[in-house]
Swiss-Prot record:
Superkingdom assignment: Bacteria
Binding-site list for ATP: 17-24
HAMAP family: IPP_trans (MF_00185)
Name used for this protein in its record: tRNA dimethylallyltransferase
GO molecular function: ATP binding; tRNA dimethylallyltransferase activity
Gene: miaA
Organism of this sequence: Escherichia coli O6:H1 (strain CFT073 / ATCC 700928 / UPEC)
Length: 316
């Protein structure tokens, strides 16, 4: 697409970053100044009743700056990147029609990628095929299935850990249904995003600082009632660790504690470690992201001013 045709597209802003980097605070600050409406880009914030452990914006923050695509699913329900793209495009169109600019804020990089580049035409899940794969795993083990994937799709096998049954079974399922590998199909992208996007990533300058923030925030969550929040989910009886909601960082570790599998101290340790690993993955993804403007979260006023400088021309 030429620069001229790009310039004629409606505007949008991406504010990306690792967990605990200050994205929400900056987005709320920007909403006071720019004609923007916020859309959450977070695979954990979509769930109702999961507020403390996801660091969901509180009632006061949401009053000052409403976020779309929060609390749109029960924890028992699944939500895919395709679901997000459909919902986000609808919200963006609504915001643009009102003469305002969509500001998409969050840390689920897969959602940002799906929105920006479109989705490859992967086949829908097939319960029968999935059941056969799981039966084979029960009989032979996931290591055996991982070796099978190495023969079928070595690129996907290199990316997927043998202890990640969800992604492993999906890669095999795609091949068994379509006859094409996951790698082959994902190289065929869908429709690009019909917006002129200004992309920002916010993070602390030092990894140690981010690690400190993550640990502090995890302890703040515990002090704010995180255990009680997960106990309420646990008591429902219909939720389990195979669900994406309960696999969210922090929730999975607390769940293991409530099931008596690990001690409280071990839960805290694992929760902090898992959150740090998530942040590392998010930063790794962002480092390979093209056209992103980096912001230092330790200098919030400077970060705000840099965004205003870049997008100020579109605010009129």
């Amino acid at each position: 697409m030429s620069d001229i045709s790009k310039a004629s597209l409606p505007k949008a802003i991406f504010l990306m970053g690792p967990t605990a980097s200050g994205k929400t605070a900056l987005a709320i600050e920007l909403r006071k100044i720019l004609p923007v409406e916020l859309i959450s880009v977070d695979s954990a914030l979509i769930y109702k009743g999961m507020d403390i452990g996801t660091a969901k914006p509180n009632a006061e923050e949401l009053l000052a700056a409403p976020h779309r695509l929060l609390n749109i699913r029960d924890p028992s329900q699944a939500y895919s990147a395709a679901d997000f793209r459909r919902d986000a495009l609808a919200e963006m169109a609504d915001i643009t029609a009102a003469g305002r600019i969509p500001l998409l804020v969050g840390g689920t990089m897969l959602y940002f990628k799906a929105l920006l580049e479109g989705l490859s035409p992967l086949p829908s899940a097939d319960p029968e095929v999935r059941a056969r794969i799981e039966q084979q795993a029960a009989e032979q083990g996931w290591e055996s299935l991982h070796r099978q994937l190495q023969e079928i799709d070595p690129v996907a096998a290199a990316r997927i850990h043998p202890n990640d049954p969800q992604r492993l079974s999906r890669a095999l399922e795609v091949f068994f249904i379509s006859g094409k590998t996951l790698t082959e199909l994902t190289q065929t992208s869908g429709d690009a995003l019909p917006y002129q996007v200004h992309q920002f990533a916010i993070a602390p300058a030092s990894r140690e600082l981010l690690h400190q923030r993550i640990e502090q925030r995890f302890h703040q969550m515990l002090a704010s009632g995180f255990e009680a929040e997960v106990r309420a989910l646990f008591a429902r009886g219909d939720l389990h660790t195979d669900l994406p909601s309960i696999r969210c960082v922090g929730y999975r570790q607390m769940w293991s504690y409530l099931e008596g599998e690990i001690s409280y101290d071990e839960m805290v340790y694992r929760g902090v470690c898992a959150t740090r690993q998530l942040a590392k993955r998010q930063i790794t993804w962002l480092r390979g992201w093209e056209g992103v403007h980096w912001l230092d979260s330790e200098k919030p006023e400077q970060a705000r001013d840099e965004v205003l400088q870049v997008v100020g021309a579109i605010a009129g």
